[in-house]
Design a protein with these regions (language model features):
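Histidine-centered catalytic micro-motifs
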Residues: 58-70, 128
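Single, functionally critical "micro-switch" positions that shape active/binding sites
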Residues: 61-65, 94-95, 119
Length: 155
């Protein structure tokens, strides 16, 4: 696949914004960035995507997330404010985890994955470990990750 007509952000040293360049992608990996005319000449049959003068950059990486936390967005901890992190676990996270059904695990993962894709994140590390973790939940999360078309390390 060739991505054409974009402004390519390299994030290299030094970071650059390249114009009149194209990106060759093979097997879901950037293989080459070169002059657009050169890549078009060398790969005339390659599938093409017109970036229409928009910015193109490598995907972001989220190195720590909890997909099941999607259901706690905006949720207040009941009662008095927690004194410390263990109390937050006891009052919010562990009760939430204990109440999740397998379909809830899948849905919460998909909510987070859609949000990740919308914001340019293509690789995530999800920590799905807590006292009430459902047997087989990592398999369900892995299926959601595959459906979303991103990469993830699940633990």
């Amino acid at each position: 696949m060739l991505i054409l007509n974009g402004k390519i952000i390299t994030w290299g040293e030094p970071a650059q914004i390249l114009e009149n360049q194209a990106i060759l992608i093979r097997d879901n990996r950037i293989q080459e960035i070169a002059a657009q005319a050169d890549l078009l000449a060398r790969f005339p049959q390659e599938e093409r995507i017109d970036a229409k003068d928009q910015y193109v950059m490598p995907g972001n990486i989220c190195a720590h997330t909890h997909f099941y936390g999607a259901f706690s967005r905006g949720m207040a901890i009941p009662g008095a404010p927690a004194k410390d992190f263990p109390e937050i676990l006891e009052k919010l996270w562990w009760p939430l985890d204990k109440s999740l059904l397998m379909e809830d695990v899948r849905s919460s993962a998909l909510v987070c994955l859609v949000d990740a894709v919308k914001h340019g994140t293509t690789t995530l590390i999800d920590h799905h470990a807590s006292p009430g973790a459902i047997t087989g939940s990592l398999d369900v999360i892995a299926e959601a990750v595959e459906q979303a078309g991103v990469r993830a390390s699940l633990c």
